Structures are given as structure tokens and as C-alpha cells.
């Protein structure tokens, strides 16, 4: 698949120890062997490239740092509201709200950056870093307003960058783009590279769509 992580085999590697180091469940080791058609698991030549589905990779939640902030911005986390300042960090599950003159820039675990515009409500659903690579698994929910993103190249890292809105889903690897949500109208502007946007019919949940 397009979002597979490419792992380069080192001396002494086997499907078993790769699984124990980097994957979510030990149950993946026979699947890893099958997926890559490994005939002799104990004698994989160093330098061999193995494909690992992104969904199998173990990851850790990472804080997101605010590198710039203007005007009034608050975060709601576990029912508690707090005014934000530059240099502070937020975590998965945080809901951001900017005022009419408010904006902020987020530095994400994989080095991607997101500029959250005025009059915007944005939930940071997922902010994780893959243990096997520098790739990030990022998911945001844009409830209203706009967010402009400069995303690091996620090809071969197992990384994903998803923005979910009431009107659709936008997914990307390695580009710069802006997403605006206004009354169930989704507008995606590509500033550099390519993105994929998927419209969601009223009353239905969106499926995650990856750029390929």
C-alpha cells in the first residue's frame, strides 16, 4: 500500500524481533512474513527492504508546541478551559478556539506545522510519532474556520496527516495546503504539492482517504 513504512533489514533481524521492537502486537510477526513473502525468516539479507502497513506500527503520543500566537486563543481539555501563550504545549484530545483576531502556529511531532486562523475551532484528535521512524500520525477535526498546513514528506515513513471536517476528509503526504470549513462547505486550497479531499454526504461519517 502507498502508506507502508519501508524498513531496511539489518544484520540479525528477523520478523520476530522486528515485530517485538516496532509493531503493536506480537501477532503481526507471521503477517509480516506473509506480507513480504519471506521464505527464510532467519536468513534475511541485510539491506532488504520490508514493507510494513502503517496500521501495524507502534506509536507514542507526543505533545504539540505552540511556536507563535496572536490575539485570543483558548484550549479546552477534559472540560477545563485555559488561555494559551506562545511556548506552551497541548496534547491529544485538546480543542482549540481562536477569537476574531486570534491565530496560532502548531509544531507537530514529525516537524509539520499548522497555522490555525481566526474564528476557528479545531480538535487535535491524534498527535503521535511512530517508534520505527520519524513519521507522525496526525489527525485533526476542523469544526469551523481554517487551518493552513506545511506537511513533512510522509512517503515510506508510515506517517499520515488527516483533517476531518463535517463536510469531508482531507489527507496528504508531503505538501502545503489550506482547509476551510464554513457551514458544511469544505474548501481545500493546494499551495504546494497535492492533496486528496473526499466529500461526505449529509448524515454520513467520512472514510479516511490517503494521498497516493
Regions from the PLM with identified roles:
Residues 2, 21-61:
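Extracellular LysM carbohydrate-binding repeats and other cell-envelope/extracellular binding modules
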Residues 2-23:
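Primarily a LysM-type cell-wall glycan-binding module
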Residues 12-14, 37, 49, 121:
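Disulfide-stabilized cysteine-rich extracellular repeat microdomains
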Residues 15-16, 29, 41, 113:
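Internal amphipathic alpha-helical segments of the cytochrome P450 catalytic fold
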Residues 45-49, 55-212:
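Flexible, surface-exposed loop/linker segments and immediately adjacent secondary-structure boundaries
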Amino acid at each position: 500500500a502507498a502508506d507502508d513504512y519501508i524498513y531496511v533489514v539489518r544484520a540479525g533481524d528477523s520478523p520476530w524481533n522486528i515485530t517485538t521492537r516496532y509493531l503493536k502486537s506480537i501477532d503481526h510477526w507471521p503477517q509480516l512474513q506473509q506480507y513480504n513473502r519471506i521464505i527464510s525468516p532467519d536468513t534475511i539479507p541485510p539491506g532488504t527492504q520490508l514493507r510494513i502497513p502503517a496500521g501495524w506500527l507502534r506509536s507514542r503520543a507526543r505533545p504539540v508546541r505552540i511556536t507563535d500566537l496572536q490575539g485570543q486563543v483558548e484550549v479546552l481539555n477534559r472540560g477545563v478551559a485555559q488561555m494559551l501563550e506562545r511556548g506552551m504545549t497541548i496534547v491529544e484530545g485538546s480543542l482549540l478556539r481562536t477569537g476574531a483576531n486570534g491565530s496560532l502556529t502548531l509544531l507537530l511531532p514529525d516537524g509539520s506545522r499548522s497555522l490555525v486562523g481566526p474564528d476557528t475551532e479545531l480538535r487535535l484528535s491524534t498527535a503521535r510519532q511512530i517508534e520505527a521512524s520519524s513519521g507522525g500520525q496526525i489527525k485533526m477535526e476542523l469544526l469551523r474556520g481554517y487551518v493552513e498546513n506545511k506537511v513533512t514528506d510522509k512517503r515510506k515513513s508510515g506517517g499520515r496527516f488527516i483533517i476531518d471536517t463535517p463536510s469531508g476528509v482531507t489527507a496528504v503526504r508531503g505538501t502545503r495546503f489550506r482547509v476551510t470549513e464554513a457551514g458544511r462547505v469544505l474548501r481545500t486550497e493546494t499551495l504546494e504539492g497535492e492533496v486528496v479531499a473526499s466529500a461526505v454526504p449529509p448524515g454520513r461519517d467520512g472514510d479516511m482517504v490517503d494521498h497516493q
